[in-house]
UniProtKB/Swiss-Prot annotation:
This is Ribulose bisphosphate carboxylase large chain. Substrate binds at residues 126, 176, 180, 297, 329, 381. Its cofactor is Mg(2+). It comes from Methylacidiphilum infernorum (isolate V4) (Methylokorus infernorum (strain V4)). The record marks 336 as: Transition state stabilizer. Its EC number is 4.1.1.39. GO terms for biological process: reductive pentose-phosphate cycle. The gene is cbbL. PANTHER family: RIBULOSE BISPHOSPHATE CARBOXYLASE, RIBULOSE BISPHOSPHATE CARBOXYLASE LARGE CHAIN. The keyword Ubl conjugation does not apply.
Length: 486
């Protein structure tokens, strides 16, 4: 047996002979298969165990993520077996490594309509523990429009959010309240007020602030919304605070969401750790109730960061767009968190565009047609500050939320000054871009000139001018080119 032994299959048996038959011989590898428009396509990176042939390993992934088990079973004869089995139709080596990419097609009938939980259970639910593989990573998916249309998609989307807020032509600005844990509800609200009156559009609960003994959720929300309303009255702008509704049960999450709506909040938040079903459920509630939904990708790096095992974040981005979030954290390029330029730009394309072409440079293995589904607003947060504004706008574009937590609250002249510094930086950079200037090259000079009339910006740049997070990324694109499949 190829999977368990020395890589020599021996004499080929009948497909229906009792016992163990190599996955490739059972039809899970088919080099002649031409994927259908309606197939879900997957690209898996894998490292086989010694003695396991790459084609057999790819076939095993196709089998174990669809209909196969470890031995021949007679009940296969009671199904349209060839229709339902996953089909590995191509295996490519990754140059200079011991890794391979398996391209697998799944018939749409294998998946429940409109369910991220079912799709993820099918494709990644069991196969990642398979002993015949040293490692396995789901790199990308092509989700056909036929299946895309079974999902709600973003509760509102980028354009509707801008219309809600009446804010156009620039990135939106936010800040996560710091310290994330330990503040009283009243002091928490003071941070929100200072940041919003200083020029930010949003403030945010962090992923692990829910309802702890030092600050219960209801108390926090009352003070936060008082701060939001006061800042809106003073500035004449629509403002918001991401109220984190993540809780132990869906009943509690709905209770918190309803209270947020009662208080007049334009936005709520949920953590990725709440699970796919909870996220989809809250997205449906948000569309029904006219509330924006922010997703914090808490916990994602436990399975997205490593190069050879887990799930690439571009897959999570696709799933969350289908699930229906309006915002998702997707990397900064220049901040403290993992994400090289090309990977992050690939994530942003996945979230925002209506049609994405395959692009190996950005790590995009497949084309993706979103069938007019609204886009998701990517969020850049984690170790960014006003002095990087030219880089952020150049790399990430304007349909982005830039969140400066420490870069607002850590300002030497206080929270409002930190917010003002960020607002001035984005305004001058957008103006320069609109005037046709090369902001990537001229950005430092543009900021320096703005510092002459903005003491807040000058202090921010002076404080953080020497701060950088120049570490090599653990994951950069090396996609094996995948031809467009018509």
């Amino acid at each position: 047996m190829v999977i368990a032994g020395d890589g020599k299959a021996g004499a080929k048996k009948s497909r229906w002979s009792a016992g163990v038959t190599p996955y490739a011989e059972m039809g899970y590898y088919n080099a002649d298969y031409v994927p259908k428009d309606t197939d879900i396509l997957a690209a898996f990176r894998f490292v086989p165990q010694e003695g396991v042939e790459p084609i057999e390993a790819g076939a095993a992934v196709a089998g174990e993520s669809s209909t196969a088990t470890w031995t021949v079973v007679w009940t296969d004869r009671l199904t349209a077996y060839e229709h339902y089995q996953g089909k590995c139709f191509r295996v490519e080596p990754v140059p200079g490594t011991n890794q391979y990419i398996a391209f697998i097609a799944y018939d749409l009938d294998l998946f429940e309509e409109g369910s991220i939980a079912n799709m993820s259970s099918s494709i990644i639910g069991n196969v990642f523990g398979f002993k015949a593989l040293k490692s396995l990573r789901l790199e990308d998916l092509r989700i056909p429009p036929h299946y895309v249309k079974t999902f709600q998609g973003p509760a509102h989307g980028i354009m509707m959010e801008r219309e809600y807020l009446n804010k156009y032509g620039r990135p939106l600005l936010g800040a996560t309240v710091k310290p994330k844990l330990g503040l009283s509800a009243k002091n928490y609200g003071r941070v929100v007020y200072e940041a919003l009156r200083g020029g930010l559009d949003f403030t945010k609960d962090d992923e692990n602030i829910n309802s702890q003994p030092f600050m219960r959720w209801r108390d926090r929300w009352l003070f936060c919304m008082e701060a939001v309303n006061k800042a809106m009255a003073e500035t004449g702008e629509i403002k918001g605070h991401y109220l984190n509704v993540t809780a132990a049960t869906m009943e509690e999450m709905y209770e918190r969401a309803e209270f947020a709506k009662e208080l007049g909040s334009v936005i709520i938040m949920v953590d990725l750790t709440a699970g796919f079903t909870a996220i989809q459920s809250m997205a449906k509630w948000c569309r029904k109730n006219g509330v924006l939904l922010h997703l914090h990708r808490a916990g994602h790096s436990t399975y997205t960061r490593q190069k050879i095992h887990g799930v690439n974040f571009r897959v999570i981005a696709k799933w969350m767009r289908l699930a229906g979030v309006d915002h998702i954290h997707a990397g900064t390029v220049v901040g403290k968190l993992e994400g090289d330029l090309h990977s992050v730009q690939g994530y942003y394309k996945t979230l925002r565009t209506q049609y994405t072409e395959a692009d190996p440079l950005l790590g995009l293995y497949f084309e993706q047609d979103w069938a007019s589904m609204p886009g998701v607003m990517p969020v850049a947060s984690g170790g960014i500050h006003a002095g990087q504004m030219h880089l952020l706008l150049s790399y990430l574009g304007e349909d982005t939320i830039l969140q400066f937590g420490g870069g607002t609250i850590g300002h030497p002249d206080g929270i409002a000054a930190g917010a003002t510094a960020n607002r001035v930086a984005v305004e001058v950079m957008v103006q320069a871009r609109n005037e046709g200037k090369d902001i990537l090259r001229e950005g430092p000079e543009i900021l320096e000139k703005a510092c002459r009339w903005s003491p807040a910006l000058a202090k921010a740049i002076e404080t953080w001018k020497d701060i950088s997070f120049e570490f090599e990324s653990t994951d950069v694109p090396d996609a094996v080119a995948m031809p467009t499949i018509a």
